[in-house]
Amino acid sequence: MKKIMIVDDEENLVELVKAIFEQEGYEVIPAYSGKECLEKLEKVKPDLILMDMMMPEMTGKETTKKIRENPKTKNLKVAFLTVVRLSEIGKEELKKLNVLDFITKPFDNEDLVRRVKKILGD
């Protein structure tokens, strides 16, 4: 069973996305902050991390940068799931962070599942 980590400070959104992907047969690991994400990555290696950008303490961008700096996690797949518009971050920044997709909220459930399956090769 493939694992997806959802990193978002909005508990309701995490629960919604968790329900969507559990129904699709994935194991879902919730993390409610960048710090919690990094702590959980010490113990578990998800097949994909869905990362919010706007979080208190450590942004999704900062968290992804730390993931890329760690030899144990640098090759993990990361996609942003955020209210931030692509024009606000820029494609070059995404390339630098090796972010595989940029999904904006609000999202269509079927589109989200399709895009995640594409990243995971399912």
Regions found by a protein language model. Give the residues of each.
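Short acidic/polar segment at the start of the alpha1 helix of CheY-like receiver
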Residues: 10-14, 87
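Charged docking surfaces used in two-component/phosphorelay signaling
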Residues: 15-23
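Alpha4 helix (beta4-alpha4-beta5 surface) of REC/receiver domains from two-component response regulators
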Residues: 18, 62, 84-103, 110, ...
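Helix N-cap/capping motif at the beta->alpha junctions
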Residues: 30-39, 60
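Short amphipathic alpha-helix used as the core "switch/output" element in two-component signaling
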Residues: 39, 61-74
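Active-site beta3 strand of CheY-like receiver
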Residues: 44-50
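Receiver (REC) domain active-site loop signature in two-component systems and cognate sites
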Residues: 55
